[in-house]
């Protein structure tokens, strides 16, 4: 039995979240009655209202009046008044991943997992399948610039989804094709140990049916080790590694455009196919790897080479992934979601390769617990930045952790030899600090998953006011 058409009104608690909003939008486009609530107005709430979805700001028991089903994300606490009211009324309460899984049962699915790169890779797979004539349904964890949204309902038989591993619920997602970009220590608040994180990814691959396949990056040692432990599923490996089935070659990172080729080989090593002349209009080898994963899927689904080249060349990117927000006196300001040391390092490495000027990093650490558990990694991930400006930690509802704050991060960076590290008290000081550092040709990159995105968009105008 699949998702019934006559389901009644579906209420989303926390509908403005990036994952929840995408599911709500697709359900609405399928003809279901959708409503929801969130704690504050945001761009997702505005977009959903424009699509005819009723959204209330604030969580109150009466918001679920008329609802037959209530959907909640893992961020919703057990004492939420709408959740309590739903249980008092004995309404079905559905986790976000469960509802996503129900949507996935309507199509054949590609699910993209990994600690980093999921959103960009999901967008690339969607772009390639779109160009290949598949007209896919897409539910992503970020705004795809070409769509202006993170979700779309396609008429084709395929769905492309970002599989969020943060709370383990990605194991509920039924996918014919699985991608794993990398596996790093993250979300240990849920998994407790890194071994359990790795075991979850193994289960994710083993959940793929026998007629499906998994695409896995063997440049990452943890993923390569995982490949060796999976026996009964078809695996396609990718990366710069000479042993990869789909190999990234001839990478040229100059000028903010990533040029590369891809070589396909069968396991016997006898057959080889190349696609050369690929040009991805975003910087960074990590993005070339993301594109290689997407190309591996596209070729398996018989997307022609010329369509692959065209799709990669026309890729519009994802909001908050090395997004240019403006210029000031020849310096370019960017906004990026990077908030894990591996992500920050990759973004700064890409920036270093793309400009001959300075790289100025402005970081707003996200969550005290993340900074505490990865403190040494945070202190060494800014090596490609000429200057680092450290803002106060964005708590995301957490209580402070001793020794894990912006002051200690500044001290840690200096202790490990970084030559230029400055503490930032608040956004009102940012323009003055940047103005004293930036020169023509420099890149100013605002990094973090919190409110720093607003600073990044405001910064060009604030710099102009300074003259």
Swiss-Prot record:
Family matches, as HAMAP family: MurC
InterPro entries in the cross-refs: Mur-like_cat_sf, Mur_ligase_C, Mur_ligase_C_dom_sf, Mur_ligase_cen, Mur_ligase_N, MurCDEF_pg_biosynth, UDP-N-AcMur_Ala_ligase_MurC
Function: Cell wall formation.
One GO location term (cellular component): cytoplasm
Keyword list, A-Z: ATP-binding, Cell cycle, Cell division, Cell shape, Cell wall biogenesis/degradation, Cytoplasm, Ligase, Nucleotide-binding, Peptidoglycan synthesis
Pathway(s): Cell wall biogenesis; peptidoglycan biosynthesis
Gene: murC
Protein family per UniProt: Belongs to the MurCDEF family.
Organism name: Azorhizobium caulinodans (strain ATCC 43989 / DSM 5975 / JCM 20966 / LMG 6465 / NBRC 14845 / NCIMB 13405 / ORS 571)
MF (Gene Ontology): ATP binding; UDP-N-acetylmuramate-L-alanine ligase activity
Annotated ATP binding sites: 114-120
Keyword Metal-binding listed: no
GO BP annotation list: cell division; cell wall organization; peptidoglycan biosynthetic process; regulation of cell shape
Subcellular location: Cytoplasm
Catalytic reactions of this protein: UDP-N-acetyl-alpha-D-muramate + L-alanine + ATP = UDP-N-acetyl-alpha-D-muramoyl-L-alanine + ADP + phosphate + H(+)
EC number: 6.3.2.8
Protein name as catalogued: UDP-N-acetylmuramate--L-alanine ligase
Predominant cellular place of this UniProt entry's protein: cytoplasm
Gene3D superfamilies, per database record: Mur ligase, C-terminal domain, Mur-like, catalytic domain, NAD(P)-binding Rossmann-like Domain
Catalytic EC class: ligase
Any matching Pfam family: Mur_ligase
PANTHER family tied to this protein: UDP-N-ACETYLMURAMATE--L-ALANINE LIGASE (PTHR43445:SF3), UDP-N-ACETYLMURAMATE--L-ALANINE LIGASE-RELATED (PTHR43445)
């Amino acid at each position: 039995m699949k998702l019934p058409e006559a389901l009644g009104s579906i209420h989303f608690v926390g509908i403005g979240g990036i994952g929840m909003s995408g599911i709500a939008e697709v359900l609405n486009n399928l003809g279901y009655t959708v409503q929801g609530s969130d704690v504050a107005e945001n761009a997702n709430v505005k977009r959903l209202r424009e699509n005819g979805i009723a959204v209330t700001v604030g969580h109150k028991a009466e918001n679920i009046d008329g609802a037959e089903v209530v959907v909640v994300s893992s961020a919703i606490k057990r004492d939420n008044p709408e959740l309590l009211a739903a249980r008092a009324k004995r309404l079905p309460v559905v986790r976000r991943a469960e509802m996503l899984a129900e949507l996935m049962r309507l199509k054949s699915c590609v699910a993209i997992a990994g600690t980093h790169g999921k959103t960009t890779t999901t967008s690339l797979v969607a772009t390639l399948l779109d160009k290949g004539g598949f007209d896919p349904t897409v539910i992503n964890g970020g705004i795809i610039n070409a769509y202006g949204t993170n979700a779309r309902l396609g008429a084709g038989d395929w769905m492309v989804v970002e599989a969020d591993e943060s709370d383990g619920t990605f194991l509920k997602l039924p996918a014919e094709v699985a991608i794993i970009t990398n596996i790093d220590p993250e979300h240990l608040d849920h998994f407790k140990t890194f071994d359990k994180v790795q075991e979850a990814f193994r289960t994710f691959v083993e959940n793929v049916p026998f007629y499906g396949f998994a695409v896995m990056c063997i440049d990452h040692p943890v993923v390569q080790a995982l490949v060796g432990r999976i026996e009964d599923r078809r695996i396609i490996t990718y990366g710069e590694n000479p042993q990869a089935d789909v190999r990234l070659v001839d990478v040229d990172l100059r000028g903010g455009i990533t040029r590369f080729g891809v070589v396909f080989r069968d396991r016997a090593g006898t057959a080889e196919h190349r696609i050369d002349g690929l040009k991805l209009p975003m910087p960074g080898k990590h993005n070339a790897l993301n594109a290689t994963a997407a190309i591996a899927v596209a070729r398996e689904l018989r997307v022609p080479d010329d369509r692959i080249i065209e799709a990669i060349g026309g890729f519009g990117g994802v909001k908050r992934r090395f997004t240019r927000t403006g210029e000031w006196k020849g310096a370019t300001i960017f906004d990026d979601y990077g908030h894990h040391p591996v992500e920050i390092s990759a973004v700064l490495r890409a920036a270093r390769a793309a400009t001959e000027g300075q790289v100025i990093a402005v970081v707003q650490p996200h969550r005290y617990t993340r900074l505490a558990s990865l403190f040494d990694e945070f202190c060494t991930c800014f090596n490609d930045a000429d200057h680092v400006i450290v803002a106060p930690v964005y708590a995301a509802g957490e209580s402070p952790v001793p020794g894990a704050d912006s002051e200690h991060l500044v001290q840690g960076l200096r202790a490990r030899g970084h030559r230029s590290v400055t503490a930032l008290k608040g956004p009102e000081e940012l323009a003055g600090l940047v103005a004293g550092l930036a020169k023509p040709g420099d890149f100013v990159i605002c990094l973090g998953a919190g409110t720093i995105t607003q600073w990044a968009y405001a910064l060009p105008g604030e710099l102009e006011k300074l003259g």
